[in-house]
């Protein structure tokens, strides 16, 4: 297994040596986008294998929701690639330039980082997003996705490599580790420092902690954080209803979904019911403090101190009343 990883690392370093201009980068991404459109049926078929297995092994509902692909999610992946194509090429731009008194001219120029390793969990769209972003920024990437999304990740990586090959670019610019054994992650973190320049973990707390504890490679990552939405006493009601609904229910299983709503006490009587009814009517469970519960006519559960630090990743939300924006900020900073 270690030998396989070393071969992957060596191929990534070789791919990094190939210069690729902006036109070719965008052509590869454009062809990749077309391949996704053309092979939608194949992507959905492979994804079904992952979903069927997830149901069989009784994976948590929020993880299955992350895993499932459909027409809408594939359209989202396509839209993401289109946005990346439109981005200005981030490398070889002169950021700063100055001249010393002795006539020596210095330039600060953006360059690629090098080979990037990305370890992630159950979202198949991460394969496409990360591969596209790394390629646009000139960084070869080694992808290690979770076994729960194995077939979905594999088809996305194969389509990307096919697009690279079509455009005479080293297909090893994008490599997916198709080994399901957990030990491969440990080896990736501890034995690949000669080949990987930075590791990025994308997943839950346990994954990020493991990467931080084991990695001999520099890391770009985060550990914890709860997304909050604060509704001030000067807020517009209709806007607040729309923002809160979108922030919580657009996709409940992502780490960017709102988990706690903070609402100014002065507007609770007017704002509480229309905002929370919208959430409740769309299947969201309400967990609130006493002040909010007194004013909300719908069904809710009493919040405990532990609820303010919970990342539900599902259709649940905590609601707390605050006296002002300072109290809201202090609560978030806890």
Where are these regions (language model features)?
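Rossmann-like NAD(P) dinucleotide-binding subdomain of oxidoreductase/dehydrogenase enzymes
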Residues: 86, 95-234, 238
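Conserved C-terminal structural/oligomerization subdomain of aldehyde/semialdehyde dehydrogenase
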Residues: 304-334
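ALDH superfamily catalytic-core signature
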Residues: 2, 122-125, 129-140, 159, ...
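N-terminal Rossmann-like NAD(P)+-binding subdomain of aldehyde/semialdehyde dehydrogenases
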Residues: 1-108, 133
């Amino acid at each position: 297994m270690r030998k396989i990883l070393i071969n992957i690392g060596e191929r990534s370093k070789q791919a990094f040596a190939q210069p690729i201009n902006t036109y070719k980068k965008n052509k590869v991404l454009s062809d990749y986008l077309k391949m996704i459109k053309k092979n939608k049926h194949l992507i959905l078929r492979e994804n079904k294998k992952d979903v069927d297995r997830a149901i069989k092994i009784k994976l948590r509902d929020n993880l299955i929701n992350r895993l499932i692909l459909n027409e809408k999610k594939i359209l989202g992946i396509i839209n993401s690639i289109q946005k990346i194509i439109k981005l200005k090429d981030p490398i070889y731009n002169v950021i700063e330039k100055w001249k010393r008194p002795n006539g020596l001219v210095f330039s600060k120029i953006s360059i690629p980082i090098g080979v990037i390793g990305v370890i992630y969990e159950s979202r198949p769209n991460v394969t496409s997003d990360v591969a596209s972003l790394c390629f646009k920024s000139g960084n070869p990437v080694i992808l290690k996705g979770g076994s729960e999304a194995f077939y979905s990740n594999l088809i996305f990586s194969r389509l990307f490599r096919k697009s690279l090959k079509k455009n005479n670019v080293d297909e090893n610019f994008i490599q997916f580790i198709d080994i399901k054994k957990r030990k491969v992650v440990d080896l990736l973190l501890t034995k690949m420092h000669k080949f990987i320049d930075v590791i990025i973990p994308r997943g839950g707390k346990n994954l990020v902690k493991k990467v931080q504890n084991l990695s001999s490679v520099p890391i770009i990552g985060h550990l914890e954080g709860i997304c909050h939405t604060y509704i001030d006493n000067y807020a517009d009601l209709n806007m607040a209803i729309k923002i809160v609904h979108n922030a919580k229910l657009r996709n409940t299983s992502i780490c960017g979904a709102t988990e706690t709503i903070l609402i100014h006490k002065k507007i609770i009587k007017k704002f509480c019911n229309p905002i929370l009814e919208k959430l409740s009517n769309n299947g969201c469970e309400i967990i609130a403090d006493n002040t909010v519960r007194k004013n909300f006519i719908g069904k809710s559960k009493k919040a405990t101190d532990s609820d303010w630090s919970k990342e539900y990743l599902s259709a649940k939300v905590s609601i707390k009343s605050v006296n002002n924006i300072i109290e809201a900020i202090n609560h978030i900073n806890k």
